[in-house]
């Protein structure tokens, strides 16, 4: 594990590869031993200060208390938290190492907290890099400090209420995505695609991705209470990430099919767009390498065929890539015979017939859907 340490403005701040907020919330989720201990503390109307990790940086700010080094148990955490000092757990949370400790972090580390316990928690988290939990006995609130972030841990009912509203929004987004994706598929078969058609699908794919991340964070925080929510999320999102990759492969402005690195860079740039930029098709066009003008939105496009052939059962990506690089576009693939397909190195007669039948069925079903 890479370790970098340094001091800034007189502050002894240690930068280590430490747990993220997401990882920490997973450890605090309902159904986990740590959450059980926190619930017992809340029910007992006592406060607590808990450090989730131990090394020399934690040892350096510990004053007093006593060494335990015993197996973690929710009941033990509850009893030890009755004392005024902090409880220090091992990095994996399996053992209670110290109790009734006075934490003395660097007072020059800035904090917006007002209470003594919360100020110590935030400064300790910043200085050591380990997550620190503060339980307020007066307000019955659990706050976790990690990676420079402050997060109040809500109860499951609050998270579920919020997540159910977000799921309803995701359902609307997914319905619209399915609609514009079908329209694009029809336009591809009829060779009547515009840049606006493509950017509409790109926008909707990204909107689904972003809202699904919000729900996924709730799933992590819910723990065992989020199983049903997780099933709903997985069903709605489906293969959204694959669809994002395929549309980049089909429509990136690069003259040749984009490399894996180019696809990854394009998706990363899409991820970095602000919500307002995501609503602007000219910005999306620029990400794909096209002119960022309103006039360019009516430009004719031609699919390379990655999306279409992904719908053919059992067809491997390696075969799809070979065919796209050989024929250049979906229209050329649709016009190719089984013999033409077989002429590509790596495509045998059986695969050629399978692909030819798959493309024919795809064209027929797409046109039938439009007429229905």
UniProtKB/Swiss-Prot annotation:
UniProt activity-regulation remark: Diadenylate cyclase activity is inhibited by the interaction with RadA.
DAC domain: residues covered: 18-156
Keywords: ATP-binding, DNA damage, DNA repair, DNA-binding, Magnesium, Manganese, Nucleotide-binding, Nucleotidyltransferase, Transferase
GO molecular function: adenylate cyclase activity; ATP binding; diadenylate cyclase activity; DNA binding
Domain of life: Bacteria
NCBIfam families (alphabetical): PRK13482.1
PANTHER family: DIADENYLATE CYCLASE, DNA INTEGRITY SCANNING PROTEIN DISA
Complexes and interactors: Homooctamer. Interacts with RadA; this interaction leads to the inhibition of the diadenylate cyclase activity of DisA.
The name this protein goes by in its record: DNA integrity scanning protein DisA
Species in which this protein is naturally found: Mycolicibacterium smegmatis (strain ATCC 700084 / mc(2)155) (Mycobacterium smegmatis)
Gene: disA
């Amino acid at each position: 594990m890479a370790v970098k340490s340094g001091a800034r403005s007189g502050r002894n701040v240690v930068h280590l590869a430490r747990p993220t907020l997401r990882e920490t919330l997973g450890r605090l989720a309902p159904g986990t031993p740590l959450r059980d201990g926190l619930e017992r503390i809340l029910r007992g109307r006592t406060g607590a200060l808990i450090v989730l990790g131990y090394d020399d940086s934690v040892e350096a700010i510990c004053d007093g208390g006593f060494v335990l080094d015993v197996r973690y148990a929710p009941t033990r955490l509850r009893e030890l938290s009755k004392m005024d000092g902090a409880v220090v757990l091992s990095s994996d949370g399996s053992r209670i190492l110290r109790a009734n400790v006075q934490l003395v972090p660097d007072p020059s580390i800035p904090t917006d907290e007002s209470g003594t316990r919360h100020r110590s928690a935030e400064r300790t988290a910043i200085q050591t890099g380990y997550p620190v939990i503060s339980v307020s006995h007066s307000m019955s609130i659990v706050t976790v400090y990690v990676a420079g972030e402050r997060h109040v841990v809500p109860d499951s009912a609050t998270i579920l209420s919020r997540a159910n509203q977000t799921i309803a929004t995701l359902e609307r987004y997914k319905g619209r995505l399915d609609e514009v994706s079908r329209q694009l598929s029809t336009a591809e078969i009829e060779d009547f695609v515009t840049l606006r058609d493509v950017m509409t699908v790109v926008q909707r794919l990204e909107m689904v991705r972003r809202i699904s991340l919000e729900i996924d964070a709730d799933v992590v925080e819910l723990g065992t209470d989020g199983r049903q929510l997780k099933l709903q999320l997985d069903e709605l999102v489906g293969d959204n990430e694959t669809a994002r990759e395929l549309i980049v492969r089909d429509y990136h402005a690069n003259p040749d099919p984009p490399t894996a690195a180019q696809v990854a860079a394009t998706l990363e740039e899409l991820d970095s767009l602000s919500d307002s930029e995501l609503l602007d098709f000219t910005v999306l066009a620029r990400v794909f390498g096209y002119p960022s003008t309103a006039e360019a939105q009516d430009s004719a496009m031609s699919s390379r065929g990655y999306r279409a052939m992904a719908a053919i059962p059992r067809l491997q990506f390696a075969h799809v890539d070979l065919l796209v690089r050989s024929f250049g576009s979906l229209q050329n693939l649709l016009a190719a015979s089984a013999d033409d397909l077989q002429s590509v190195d790596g495509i045998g007669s059986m695969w050629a017939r399978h692909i030819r039948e798959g493309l024919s069925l795809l064209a027929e079903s797409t046109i039938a859907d439009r007429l229905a």
